[in-house]
Amino acid sequence: MTLVRTALALLALYVCVHAQKLTPLATRPDWASLEKFQGTISKEEFNRLLTQVYAPGGAWQEYFTIAEDHATVATGEGEPPFRLEFAPDAANAKPVPRYWQPRNSLRGLRIALDPGHLGGEWAKMEERWFQIGNNKPVTEGDMVLYVAKLLKSELERRGASVSLTRSSSKPATNLRPDKLKGPAVRSLRDQGRSVNPASLKSEAERLFYRTAEIRARAKKVNGQLKPDLVLALHFNAESWGNPARPTLTGLNHLHLLVSGCYSARELSYEDQRYDLMAKLLNRSYDKEVAVSRAVAQSMARATRLPPYNYTGDSAINVGGSPYVWARNLLANRLFECPVVYLEPYVMNNKEVHDRVQLGDYSGRRNINGIPRESIYREYVRGVVEGLEAYYNR
């Protein structure tokens, strides 16, 4: 009898865990929170956003249905789907309930700057750190924080209200890798990877600096800052090989990301289906694309960089700009407002590395025969000019 009870308990635990297929550190979605969106979107608009932006290539078909007057999306296993009633047409749609406002001026615009990664003592763990010989280390987290502080000043001078998701290298999350070993084991098994001391350490660290940290920032953005726009600031990189002996590359490029392009595998997770619905229904996409297109144009002009081109199926080109792509990332998925996600400069490009060694400076210096601002001020100018072009048009 004891063995039977034990077997039944294990079976119940398996069924519970299986029914709640969630990505690492996610909580069960509150599907009822989407009820406020009933009647706020037409069938045509929902179909466009779902099938062309968020789940292209038929990725949506296993989990969503679209009928004449409603759509459904699968929730937890064994539970009824969430049903969304469509508006009769766009003209008769109810107002969209959301915290962000589609303002048309930089003055009064609420902007949250999200300097990617952490930097500081965490930079090596994040693998966003490299050093050539005795030169100054290149640390993305510290570099984008410097950009954010310069950018904050410039945007505030133009009347925007600006906040930062972090103002130091201190993590927003209270979790640390040693508290994430259980989730790390589950994550490794979900990926079909072996669990050993090295993989467990690496995955627990990844869940700390990427997953837990981004989720903590999203909680701050959505619950406290409630901006009209998030600017996610990053530098890009190509593989630099052996961390002990990194190599420089001749490649250098620019691209910007908006939320979209979920795969069928990603949509097998209940929380990702919920996140897609929340993002789609608050109508971030068109604003994200429009602002990203304007910023991409000014960044391309400021940086003189060609567009990066995705060759796989993890991203789709959108907005009529070769620089703007839709991709499903945790940050642009969880922030419940338009997000412009910037990826300029390849950090381990030789010229970029040399410019980082120069640090910040006023005026211009000769860089390969061209007078250039510091890489930080060039970044800031590209962003500011793009925002001015869009919001003050």
Regions found by a protein language model. Name each.
Residues L10-A19:
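Hydrophobic h-region of N-terminal signal peptides that target proteins for export
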Residues T2-A9:
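Sec-dependent signal peptide recognition
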